[in-house]
């Protein structure tokens, strides 16, 4: 008990002594917060592959970065198109340059992919997946065709049930990846998932 009182007393004395040293205090002025300027969005048409002669190029977007709002915000679209997608395009061009893959379509590359070649697997997948993603979205939304709706109703019971299962698959996907609606070998519509930049091809 005496030791505890002694320690507390010493701590108090040190605290009082350090508080009494006014000559060591320095007055500072805290600046007012700066206004943060909102970054201007670029134009998707300005995004080009580094190698203009490369086998793969940027296809362009049929809408502005903010064209899918409120469902997908402009910053997300700009990041995916002008950073991720062009990055996959540039790295894919580098990976296939001077190889027999340089003359192949992206679909041909993916269908006969050597899964051990990570640079081609990731960048070809990222290039294809993002092209597909951007192509199927429309600025004003859209409706499924009668043929697609009929197939969805046949294989999932209803469009609402399909949306629920599709959303559930996306929610359960751990990390980055994709959710796909595809036909299996029997022609039945099924929902599948792939990790990272893999795809059903």
Question: PLM features: what roles do these ranges have?
Answer:
Residues 4, 20-201:
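Feature for soluble, non-membrane regions of globular proteins
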Residues 15-18:
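C-terminal motif of bacterial Sec signal peptides marking the signal peptidase cleavage site
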Residues 5-13:
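Sec-dependent N-terminal signal peptides
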């Amino acid at each position: 008990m005496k030791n505890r009182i002694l320690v507390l007393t010493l701590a108090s004395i040190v605290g009082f002594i350090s508080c009494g040293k006014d000559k060591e205090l320095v007055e500072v002025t805290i600046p007012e917060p700066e206004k943060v300027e909102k970054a201007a969005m670029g134009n998707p048409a300005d995004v080009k592959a580094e190698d203009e002669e490369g086998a793969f190029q940027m296809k362009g977007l049929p809408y502005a970065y903010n064209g899918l709002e409120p469902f997908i915000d402009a910053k997300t679209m700009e990041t995916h198109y002008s950073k991720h997608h062009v990055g996959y395009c540039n790295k894919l061009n580098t990976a296939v340059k001077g190889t027999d893959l340089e003359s192949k379509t992206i679909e041909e590359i993916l269908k006969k992919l050597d899964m051990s070649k990570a640079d081609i697997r990731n960048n070809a997948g990222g290039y294809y997946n993002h092209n597909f993603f951007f192509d199927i979205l429309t600025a004003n939304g859209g409706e499924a065709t009668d043929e697609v709706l009929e197939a969805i109703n046949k294989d999932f019971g209803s469009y609402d049930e399909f949306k629920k299962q599709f959303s559930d698959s996306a929610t359960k996907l751990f990390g980055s990846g994709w959710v796909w609606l595809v036909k299996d070998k029997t022609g039945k519509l099924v929902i599948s998932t792939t990790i990272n930049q893999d795809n059903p091809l």
